[in-house]
Design a protein with these regions (language model features):
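Class I S-adenosyl-L-methionine
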Residues: 1-108, 214
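A contiguous loop/helix-start segment that scaffolds small-molecule binding in enzyme catalytic cores
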Residues: 5-7, 156-250
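Fold-independent oxyanion-binding glycine-rich loops
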Residues: 10-14, 35-37, 53-56, 80-82, ...
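Short, solvent-exposed amphipathic alpha-helical segments in soluble enzyme
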Residues: 21-25, 43-44, 92-95, 125, ...
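A generic local secondary-structure boundary/capping motif
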Residues: 66, 122-124, 148-152, 181-183, ...
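A polyampholytic, Gly/Pro-enriched intrinsically disordered region
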Residues: 73-79, 126-137, 156-159, 211-220
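Class I SAM-dependent methyltransferase SAM-binding "motif I" and its flanking Rossmann-like core
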Residues: 85-157
Length: 250
């Protein structure tokens, strides 16, 4: 008997951000596979086996999930945010392509989730209200030269930007270089949003002009949003908000 594999996003952190479809997938799963921190968000119950694993073993995790599904289990692979954004959905399909006949009978479903990027944007207004791009600043899976090229092109195109994985203890230089490149374009009044641990008890959100933004304002739990030249800030009921207008004059 062949089981099924569901790849689901748990949202940015709060259980309030988990979609009903994902809640249903959790309820019927026999096995949950994922990074330790994400599997810890799943409540144990009878009939459910949890398979937490360390970071950077995405391919092994995907292979294990596919094999269990092929053996008849109802397997749920979990990611934070959305599983298709720098997460496990791509890892599963990468592994599937290496040996498609091995798992040809497994039904695979991807269930979307609310990303940290969109949750952060919602907290401060609508900074991604016009064209924007998303860049993963980790150079674990791609060269820094590619990241820098994409960053410069995004600035030339005047996109608002969202940065994932901006800074870690092992590679603080990448985000420092990113800030230097951003500031080299000379628009120091662009709003920069540092959104850490969005929707969790440890949430902190800060909006500063680009000229005042510092690399140590971010860590690996932070999503950084940078406005375009059109992004504005305003005060409303004592809070500073940011938004990018829907129209741009030619």
């Amino acid at each position: 008997m062949t089981g099924c594999l569901t790849i689901a996003g748990l949202g940015p952190g709060s259980s309030d951000h988990i979609t009903p479809a994902v809640e249903q997938a959790i309820a019927v799963a026999t096995d949950v596979v994922g990074y330790i921190r994400y599997v810890a968000r799943i409540a144990p119950r009878d009939g459910l086996v949890l398979h937490p694993s360390d970071n950077r073993v995405e391919a092994d995790r995907a292979r294990h999930a596919l094999d269990m599904a092929a053996a008849g289990r109802r397997v749920l692979v979990v990611s934070s945010g959305d599983p298709g954004v720098f997460a496990m959905a791509a890892a599963v399909y990468e592994v599937l392509e290496t040996d498609p006949t091995r798992w040809q009978d497994v039904d695979i479903t991807v269930l979307p989730g609310i990303t940290a990027m969109l949750a952060a944007a919602a907290r401060v207004g609508a900074p991604l209200g016009h064209d924007f791009c998303v860049i993963n600043l980790s150079d674990n899976l791609k060269p820094w030269a590619m990241i820098e090229q994409r960053l410069r092109l995004a600035l030339q195109a005047d996109f608002a930007m969202a940065f994932y994985n901006p800074r870690s203890k092992s590679r603080p230089e990448g985000f420092r270089k990113t800030m230097q490149i951003l500031k080299s374009f000379g628009e120091g009044n662009r709003p920069v949003i540092f959104a850490r641990a969005v929707s969790t008890p440890d949430e902190s959100i800060m909006i500063v002009p680009l000229a005042e933004a510092q690399p140590d304002m971010a860590d690996m739990q932070t999503v950084v949003l940078v406005g375009s030249s059109q992004t504005r800030t305003l005060s409303h009921k004592g809070a500073v908000l940011a938004y990018t207008p829907r129209s741009v004059k030619g």
